[in-house]
Design a protein with these regions (language model features):
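Intrinsically disordered, low-complexity regulatory regions
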Residues: 1-114
Length: 114
């Protein structure tokens, strides 16, 4: 793949593989995603669900495995997004971070089960 092709590579992986870090035009997106990650690791998600287990072995994933669908995860994305509309700024942001984590869990389910 040429350097030009790498610049338009839609996976984004080449930036990290080549040690380039986060593209400046996507810095805010990266920060928001990292805030959602932090909420899952040390915030509400960790307090309620982590139990010193990897993300793939936490209830967020295991329940979907048991029922054979990621529909519950998608429901949570929708529910949290809708609930954020009735909240003030900071609680709404936290709720949307939760929606991001549920979306990531839905992606993980598809990657492992499709």
């Amino acid at each position: 793949m040429s350097a030009t092709e790498q610049q338009v590579d839609n996976t984004g992986k080449h930036y990290f593989d080549q040690g380039k870090g986060v593209p400046i035009n996507y810095l805010r997106l990266h920060e928001i995603l990292m805030d959602a990650f932090a909420q899952a690791v040390v915030g509400k998600g960790a307090e309620r669900h982590m139990q010193d287990k990897p993300f793939e072995q936490q209830p967020i994933q295991l329940i979907s495995q048991m029922v054979g669908s990621n529909a519950g995860l998608i429901y949570q994305v929708c529910k949290k997004s809708q609930e954020s509309l009735r909240m003030s700024k900071e609680p709404a942001i936290k709720e949307l971070h939760g929606a991001i984590v549920y979306a990531a869990a839905a992606i993980l389910y598809l990657e492992e089960n499709a």
